[in-house]
C-alpha cells in the first residue's frame, strides 16, 4: 500500500495542498498500522502486542477517517457530482465497517482470551483500509480532472 501511495503522490503531488496533506496523513496511518502488526524483516512469528503502537494507530485511524469525512471529501470534489456520489457512498459504508471493528476489538483491552479475534479484526481493518484507499484514489483522480 505504501508503494501505491508513493506512486499516487508522484502523479498528483504539488497540485493541491489539501490532497498533499491528506496523502501525508495516509502515509502516517500506514506506518502506524505496519508498526502495530510488526511488519518488519526477521520478525518472530508471535510477538507481544505493543500497546503504545495500538494506541497510536487507533488515534491516527480515527483522525484520518474524521478528516476524510469532515474536511477532505467535500473540499476536493464539487457537490452533486454524480461520478463521486457512488464513491462517497462506498466510503461511508467503509467507515462504518472500520468503526465497527474498532468499537468491537481495537478499543478494548487485549488479553489471551481474545487475542485471536483481535488479530482477525486487525487483518479486517487492513483489508478495509486497502479498499478505502482505492475509493479515495478515485476521488482524487476525479478532483484532478
From Swiss-Prot:
Its main localization is cytoplasm
Q: Which UniProt keywords apply?
A: Cytoplasm, Transcription, Transcription regulation
Top-level taxonomic group: Bacteria
Would the keyword Signal be found if you checked this record's keyword annotation?
A: no
Cellular compartments annotated: Cytoplasm
Quick one: a GO cellular component term?
Answer: cytoplasm
Q: Which InterPro entries match?
A: Rsd/AlgQ_sf (IPR038309), Sigma70_reg_Rsd (IPR023785), Sigma70_reg_Rsd_AlgQ (IPR007448)
Q: Which Gene3D superfamilies match?
A: Regulator of RNA polymerase sigma(70) subunit, domain 4 (1.20.120.1370)
Q: Which GO terms describe its biological process?
A: regulation of DNA-templated transcription
Q: What is the annotated role of this protein in its UniProt record?
A: Binds RpoD and negatively regulates RpoD-mediated transcription activation by preventing the interaction between the primary sigma factor RpoD with the catalytic core of the RNA polymerase and with promoter DNA. May be involved in replacement of the RNA polymerase sigma subunit from RpoD to RpoS during the transition from exponential growth to the stationary phase.
Q: Which HAMAP family match?
A: Rsd (MF_01181)
Subunit text: Interacts with RpoD.
Assigned protein family: Belongs to the Rsd/AlgQ family.
Name of the protein this chain belongs to: Regulator of sigma D
Amino acid at each position: 500500500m505504501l508503494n501505491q501511495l508513493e506512486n499516487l503522490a508522484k502523479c498528483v503531488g504539488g497540485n493541491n495542498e489539501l490532497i498533499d496533506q491528506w496523502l501525508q496523513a495516509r502515509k502516517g496511518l500506514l506506518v502506524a498500522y505496519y508498526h502495530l502488526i510488526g511488519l518488519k524483516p526477521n520478525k518472530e512469528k508471535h510477538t507481544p502486542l505493543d500497546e503504545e503502537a495500538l494506541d497510536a494507530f487507533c488515534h491516527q485511524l480515527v483522525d484520518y477517517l474524521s478528516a476524510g469525512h469532515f474536511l477532505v471529501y467535500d473540499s476536493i470534489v464539487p457537490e452533486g457530482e454524480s461520478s463521486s456520489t457512488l464513491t462517497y457512498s462506498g466510503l461511508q459504508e467503509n467507515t462504518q465497517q472500520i468503526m465497527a471493528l474498532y468499537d468491537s476489538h481495537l478499543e478494548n483491552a487485549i488479553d489471551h482470551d481474545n487475542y485471536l479475534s483481535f488479530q482477525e479484526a486487525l487483518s479486517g481493518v487492513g483489508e478495509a483500509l486497502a479498499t478505502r484507499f482505492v475509493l479515495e484514489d478515485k476521488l482524487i483522480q476525479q478532483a484532478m480532472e
